[in-house]
A protein has these predicted regions:
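Active-site beta-strand->loop->alpha-helix modules in alpha/beta enzyme cores, enriched
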Residues: 1-106
């Protein structure tokens, strides 16, 4: 079965919390899962923590769910400023659709 699940999450951890069980189940059933977060929310990370902690955590969490490392994509759109980047985000979604041709999108 060569089917692809595409998960679109505004921020890291939104996809895992929102549909982590589904991601895991689809992967167990032979699907490829591509996980995309549009922001690592680095501006919101507390100063005493590594600035890339959320990026590291999403890689670990998605790996636990069965997402291949190369299929965990984190863009650098600034948190709380998505409306300013509306066109760029839309362009990225179009590129993702063309590249992965997903069967299901969450």
């Amino acid at each position: 079965m060569n089917k692809t699940l595409l998960v679109l999450a505004p921020h890291t951890d939104d996809g895992e919390f929102g549909c982590g069980g589904c991601i895991s189940k689809f992967v167990q059933n032979g699907w490829r899962a591509v996980y995309v977060a549009f922001s690592a929310a680095e501006q919101s990370v507390l100063p005493h923590l590594p600035h890339d902690i959320l990026r590291t955590e999403v890689k670990e969490a998605t790996a636990t769910l069965g997402v291949a490392d190369e299929d965990c994509i984190v863009f650098d759109f600034e948190v709380r400023r998505f409306p300013e980047f509306r066109q760029q985000i839309l362009d990225r979604m179009i590129e993702l659709n063309r590249k992965y041709a997903p069967d299901i999108v969450f």
